[in-house]
Amino acid sequence: DASDEYNTLATLEHYYPKATYPYLSLSFYNLIPCCSNCNSKFKGDSTHVGNILHPYYEDFDEKATFSVSVDSLPVGKDIELSISLKQNDINDTRCEKSIERFQLDKIYEEHKDIAKEIWNKAQVYNNDRIDELYKSFYKSLGYTKDDVKNFVFCSYLRKNDINKRNHTKLTQDILMQFELNN
């Protein structure tokens, strides 16, 4: 029954400002999907073209990484989460400008609970425990070790799947830091 169906509409942002480039205002190549919070928070006609990364043509994933700083994390304590440029892109001002313009540090500061959960799971489900789960249960059902990691960490861990679920890059980067995503 069609009345039981519902649709989710993505919010679209113009990469090239429509006030400056009106002829591009309806071009699909100029419309970038984004969350409504980001779209309303960072709207404006400020010219940023050339100063920030274009999400269709440049890969933020290859230029920046999330990491957590944890010496020993007692229960109830906060976790320190940061975004830093990868070594080969340390002088990439466009990546830095993207982080600044979209206030990614502040936005991901709000997701520290997710980072903490990933860190906690990484402590319990290390590579040995993943192997144990795989051999004792999942292998007989036809799953792979990657599937087990996806189940445990509630995310996709292959690079190709980074756009399939929210916070996948955050999860992948933290697990890479703990050598669980290799």
Model-identified regions with their sequence ranges:
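Domain-level detector of nuclease and nuclease-like folds
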Residues: 41-102, 106
